[in-house]
Amino acid sequence: MNRFFNRELSWLAFNTRVLNEAKDESLPLLERLKFLAIYDTNLDEFYMIRVAGLKQLYEHKIASKGIDGASPEEQLEKIKHYLAHEIEERELEFQKIQALLFKKGLCITPYNELNLEQKAKAKAYFKEQLYALVLPFKLDSSHTFPPLANLTFALFARIKDKETQITSYALIKLPSFIFRFVELEKGLFVLAEEIVEAHLEELFLEHEILDCMAFRVTCDADIAITEDEAHDYADLMSKSLRKRNQGEIVRLQTQKGSQELLKTLLASLRSFQTHSYKKHKLTGMHIYKSAIMLNLGDLWELVNHSDFKALKSPNFTPKIHPHFNENDLFKSIEKQDLLLFHPYESFEPVIDLIEQAASDPTTLSIKMTLYRVGKHSPIVKALIEAASKIQVSVLVELKARFDEESNLHWAKALERAGALVVYGVFKLKVHAKMLVITKKTDNQLRHFTHLSTGNYNPLSAKIYTDVSFFSAKNEIANDIIKLFHSLLTSSATSNALETLFMAPKQIKPKIIELIQNEMNHKQEGYITLKANALVDSEIIEWLYQASQKGVKIDLIIRGICCLKPQVKGLSENIRVYSIVGKYLEHARIYYFKHENIYFSSADLMPRNLERRVELLIPATNPKIANKLLRILEIQLKDTLKRYELNSKGRYTKVSNPNDPLNSQDYFEKQALKTF
């Protein structure tokens, strides 16, 4: 018997749970639409990275197998088979929601159903807003098929010269920055590509439009960097980013159009060349023909529309923890260690702490890691302001996938302001979220530390659940300062920490030690692990052994889980759950009954435990430990948003009509109370 679930199929099962939220009829309509948008965006990234990686392994005949022993070719086929039916489910769900929205006054209307007055408005919009932005190409001997960047959205048409009657083909590129949903009247929306299609004869004068279809390509978007050869890492990353849009096509999505048109499009894609003059290889490319609009990720335009707030869940306002109501946050932290649970408790104290440090004349230095901070960051702006007055040292991780460009921008801005900027660590990704502020008061140095499971990003802090820890304890600050010095000298793996635990050197051995300790207690042992993913085979094997010793184990794994629970003789004492709701579960909390409870930036994956700089923090303060434990206890009682994984790999909703509990709703209501 295979002891592990396939990683890729387990991720797809997570995205299925996202799709299930779109099917939840108890949710407001735009909330359901939001989950369709998330589903599609997730799938885009899955193809850009995971499928692209498998395709590379297959085409280069690299004998690399998944944790379950499946070859790249087998995994590609399993992915295609898994999605074949689910893509249809997604289309049906969109059509259902679209019909319900129509009754509420939000109409996504096909162009051919518009009346004459509405078509006149569409024509005016085309001339004023679209004509100058679309890029039409007639494909002939002097105009070959142009390169297509990743996530290109375009129209492909068959056209006929009215004078010569010669038939040819045309490509019309639509820029990504245009509004996809054009509101012609209040509540009446038409897709931009349908407006363009209706006016193609204004782009191709003296031609008749015979056939047309929309299509979209997804390309390999992973960045391969040879760090050994990097003399200027920022410059190397900048050059690598320019190559991202030139990857091989891994997926083609098409809308309506004849089979003949599709065949011609495929032939054109096979023949055109990229900027590097390497032909695209379309072998194994996944092709999906859609009955609905392409790219449901653009539904965010409607979800965020200000006129339809009644069709969304009410916005929750995170509460300010009472200990942070004082003007001087540093005094609050000196009094006691504090733990916030975002987004239920506000992220504002984190921003305020950095802003206060930047403007406080007693501040001597700020040391901080930045992983994903977003495009408009008040935190980075405060660091830039501080850099002209005090010592600011920032490690900006340029390898944070899909945030590389934003991080590069902020790193350059910090450098210009006078901050010391380090662009990551050689062959490691710095994923630990840490901040230490050093002040001088009463002729003494005082250190204030912030550690988190989530990013220093105010926007994601409103939609991700994370825990955020503040301390003025010297032993914690000393460990963080020691780690910063290691990072600045590129010796991140050389020194072990004393109070905290770091990857790649300490976390995995510590977790194994903690599992072994519970094994010594046999049936009295108990473990709860809450993480985003469980993939590491060594950790899984130790959990299997613990189960066989009688240790009861509850796993709350939001996404990928390669462990097989409830298998007789292997894992019958292990239960695996997943919670998918309005917020993205992101906190990692690890509880061992006979030892302690910990929180961490690290998931239980080889990349986190072996190839990243991560932190595992013990909750030595009883109040904080109890708060973390209460989070786990409530989530294990969730009967509305919790799924259970069985030994066959299927997830089913946990329900109890007599005791309905949505853990995320509970935490909203109980914010600032003792959970």
Predicted segments, located by residue:
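N-terminal localization/anchoring segments of enzymes in phospholipid and broader phosphate metabolism
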Residues: 1-527, 545-549, 561-675
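Glycine/threonine-rich ATP-lid/beta-loop region of ATP-binding domains
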Residues: 537-540, 544
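Hydrophobic alpha/beta core scaffold segments
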Residues: 552-556
